[in-house]
Amino acid sequence: MASVGIEPSAAVRESTGNVTDADRLPEEMKDMKIQDDKEMEATIVNGNVTETGHIIVTTIGGRNGQPKQTISYMAERVVGHGSFGVVFQAKCLETGETVAIKKVLQDRRYKNRELQTMRLLDHPNVVSLKHCFFSTTEKDELYLNLVLEYVPETVHRVIKHYNKLNQRMPLVYVKLYTYQIFRSLSYIHRCIGVCHRDIKPQNLLVNPHTHQVKLCDFGSAKVLVKGEPNISYICSRYYRAPELIFGATEYTTAIDVWSAGCVLAELLLGQPLFPGESGVDQLVEIIKVLGTPTREEIKCMNPNYTEFKFPQIKAHPWHKIFHKRMPPEAVDLVSRLLQYSPNLRCAALDSLVHPFFDELRDPNARLPNGRFLPPLFNFKPHELKGVPVEMVAKLVPEHARKQCPWLSL
């Protein structure tokens, strides 16, 4: 395929409508040599069917002296769909492995930004890209197929499960899920320089046996370049940061932190904290809890709104939003994440060392069924690059340091 630019896909097409400097990779990422001819060369296959039983045959390898290898996938069932396309579960006939295949319509003029991002990612809390291929239809439409690891559940469905039982989610699961969300965000924000822009329970996959969480759906993800505009109509409504509602175009990765704060609150409450019925109503829901933003806070979100007159509403105390038995550490963390001023929100890495997660650092911590927790402290050197020694010592408890043999504490 012609490498003309990175595709501004449907959810990500920026306000200019054209490929701008904001669509180019920042200088420091050029060293990573993102090329189409990586190990996962994208071959083109005919057909665009996702019905149960349909078999897709593609090839991988064949570059840099590697032998070509044929892989066949049998479509099993559709597991998700939206404006982007469709996600279906499939089985690799050669290995028996179950995978998820995300199929999106591809504009031939551009590289696909989601594919470019996925090729950079390698983290235990981020869904991994196995390989990719293109498929064509009779109408000569081109589809990109991302072959991803399959994770059976989502945080959204886990929340619904506990609601049906009329139970609160065990606090250890709330801690586990939220910790892993922040670890994935710290990685994509600090190591890759990418903002996800659609953090929500539906985009957080969970293995129901190990309770390992993986962030998925990078269809809206983007490298945010300081001084360059981005669209503000991004992120699902209940999880949308206030600066986006205010129409800010020069936002930061702090929008993901706000969304993660909303997810944490939802795990604790069993329902969304800010269930707005429209964009404006979303702001009303936020104001009902946080109170009217000050002039200074509005300036931090979008300087163009400072003269706008808002109804003066007092903040609702956090301890009245959560039930009396809620641990104060949980309430404290929510309050540090859901700040109007983006620069005052607790960054993802800082959130990991918050006392709310201390239970997970206990060497005797176990799942409610007595099993071990999923790996939480297996940090790679680049994850902790530039982090002060005292903070590293807190992030990697003594009993877990064998998971990081490169550490010299």
Curated annotation (Swiss-Prot):
Enzyme Commission (EC) number: 2.7.11.1
Modified residues (N-acetylalanine): A2
Description of how the protein assembles with itself and partners: Binds to KIB1. Component of a complex made of POLAR, BASL, ASK7/BIN2 and ASK3/SK12. Binds to POLAR and BASL.
Provenance organism: Arabidopsis thaliana
One GO cellular component term: cytoplasm
Phosphotyrosine PTM sites in chain numbering: Y233
Family: Belongs to the protein kinase superfamily. CMGC Ser/Thr protein kinase family. GSK-3 subfamily.
Tissue-by-tissue expression: Roots, shoots and leaves.
PTM comment: Autophosphorylated mainly on threonine and serine residues.
Record-annotated Protein kinase domain positions: 73-357
Residues at the catalytic site: D198
Name of the protein described by the UniProt record: Shaggy-related protein kinase gamma
Family matches, as InterPro entries: GSK-3, Kinase-like_dom_sf, Prot_kinase_dom, Protein_kinase_ATP_BS, Ser/Thr_kinase_AS, STKc_GSK3
Enzyme class: transferase
Gene Ontology molecular function terms on file: ATP binding; protein serine kinase activity; protein serine/threonine kinase activity
PROSITE patterns, sorted: PROTEIN_KINASE_ATP, PROTEIN_KINASE_DOM, PROTEIN_KINASE_ST
Pfam families on file: Pkinase (PF00069)
Keyword tags: Acetylation, ATP-binding, Cytoplasm, Kinase, Nucleotide-binding, Phosphoprotein, Serine/threonine-protein kinase, Transferase
Binding-site residues for ATP, renumbered to this chain: V79, G80, H81, G82, S83, F84, G85, V86, V87, K102
GO biological process annotation, one example: meristem structural organization
